[in-house]
């Protein structure tokens, strides 16, 4: 079996060395070349035709974002960003995902070598996934998002739960942007490390008609609001009297993830049941599949993103295979379908 060919681009000689060491330690991949900046990388891409690029976010001569934008326009290929755990780093990384990067890994703030080596399996997993991923389709013209109209005011009992992983930041944006302010509350788990979820929520809040925020423990769940699970904390739905409430916990990872989609879906099945719609979007692995089955069995209507519009079809595929999905839809139909089901209650249940 041929190895996955990787080009590493980083202005730090130490990082290039560490990434090479990590990647070459896995038998199914190899670093074919390294570059200290995007201008050198441009020539090496032509020479070595790599399958995956790892790209530092902040570099001299041409920064990672400028290079990524040009690359995705002229020679689209799977890119895994390497980002710092800073506010600026998270903002740039989210912009990179918007431009078409498949995923990202974070540099530890202290003990670079030890920290990166500890991420060896995760880095290898992201490279394997990137090599097989479907590149996000970038629109050539920026069309304004059409807000869904004629959404009646609904009972505060109505709720939407969304789970996503790889490719999910852009998928979630596509789902939330058309929603009117009268939408029901949304609880969202996106696999993402601490330090990124707050920036992600703030970015979405600027783009959407609804209010988008990082979830806080104990706050009341309100219509017209979307609550994003904080990195490294499970997000659950709870009740306080007649109202829904956010619960955050630091329990062990589920399906290797914290936050976990299964944890969210199971709590929504318990407390919202047939008042809920569950949505599983693009992502690697099986997190959310068992929880979606519980949602389905509790009477919720369940949607999965179709393979053609997923960056990675892993999570939707597993949910479909378990029998917990009512309807499989293209990403551009998700917003309309979930609101239609919320409005119709169980009348349109398949």
Swiss-Prot record:
Domain CheB-type methylesterase: 153-345
EC id: 3.1.1.61, 3.5.1.44
Reaction(s) catalysed by this chain's protein: [protein]-L-glutamate 5-O-methyl ester + H2O = L-glutamyl-[protein] + methanol + H(+); L-glutaminyl-[protein] + H2O = L-glutamyl-[protein] + NH4(+)
Residue ranges occupied by any Response regulatory domain in the UniProt entry: 5-122
Keyword field contains Phosphoprotein: yes
Active site: residue positions: 165, 191, 287
One Pfam family hit: Response_reg
PROSITE patterns: CHEB, RESPONSE_REGULATORY
Gene Ontology molecular-function annotations: phosphorelay response regulator activity; protein-glutamate methylesterase activity; protein-glutamine glutaminase activity
Disruption phenotype: Mutant does not mediate chemotaxis towards casamino acids.
Keyword Metal-binding: no
Processing and modification events after translation: Phosphorylated by CheA. Phosphorylation of the N-terminal regulatory domain activates the methylesterase activity.
Coiled coil: none
Main location per the UniProt record: cytoplasm
Free-text domain note: Contains a C-terminal catalytic domain, and an N-terminal region which modulates catalytic activity. Domains are connected by a linker of approximately 25 amino acids. The structural disorder in the region homologous to the pentapeptide-binding site in E.coli may be related to the failure to bind pentapeptides.
UniProt record similarity statement: Belongs to the CheB family.
Official protein name in the record: Protein-glutamate methylesterase/protein-glutamine glutaminase
Organism of provenance: Pectobacterium atrosepticum (strain SCRI 1043 / ATCC BAA-672)
Gene that produces this protein: cheB
């Amino acid at each position: 079996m041929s190895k996955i060919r990787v080009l590493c681009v980083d202005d730090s000689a130490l990082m290039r060395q560490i990434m090479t060491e990590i990647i070459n330690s896995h038998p199914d991949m190899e670093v074919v070349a390294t570059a200290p900046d995007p201008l050198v990388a441009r020539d090496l891409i032509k020479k070595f035709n790599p399958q995956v690029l790892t790209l530092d976010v902040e570099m001299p001569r041409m920064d990672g974002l400028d290079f990524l934008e040009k690359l995705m326009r002229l020679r689209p290929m799977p890119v895994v960003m390497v980002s710092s755990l800073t506010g600026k780093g998270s903002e740039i990384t989210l912009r990179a995902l918007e431009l078409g990067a498949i995923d990202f890994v974070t540099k530890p703030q202290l003990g670079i070598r030890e920290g990166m080596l500890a991420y060896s399996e995760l880095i290898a997993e992201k490279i394997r996934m990137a090599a097989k991923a479907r590149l996000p389709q970038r629109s050539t013209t920026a069309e304004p998002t059409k807000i869904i109209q004629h959404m009646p005011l609904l009972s505060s009992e109505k709720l939407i739960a969304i789970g996503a992983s790889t490719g999910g930041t852009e998928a979630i944006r596509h789902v939330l942007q058309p929603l009117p302010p009268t939408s029901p509350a949304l609880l969202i788990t996106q696999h993402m490390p601490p330090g990124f979820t707050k920036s992600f929520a703030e970015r979405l809040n600027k783009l959407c008609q609804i209010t988008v925020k990082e979830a806080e423990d104990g706050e009341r769940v309100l219509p017209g609001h979307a609550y994003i699970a904080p990195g490294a904390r499970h997000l659950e739905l709870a009740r306080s009297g007649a109202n829904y409430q956010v619960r955050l916990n630091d329990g062990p990872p589920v399906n290797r993830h914290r936050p976990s989609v299964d944890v969210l879906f199971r709590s929504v099945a318990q407390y919202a049941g047939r008042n809920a719609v569950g949505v599983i979007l693009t992502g690697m692995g099986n997190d959310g599949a068992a929880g979606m089955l519980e949602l389905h069995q509790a009477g919720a209507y369940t949607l999965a993103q179709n393979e053609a519009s997923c960056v990675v079809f892993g999570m939707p595929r597993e949910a479909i295979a378990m029998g917990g999905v009512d309807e499989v839809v293209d990403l551009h139909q998700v917003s309309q379908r979930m609101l239609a089901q919320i409005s119709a209650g169980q009348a349109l249940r398949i």
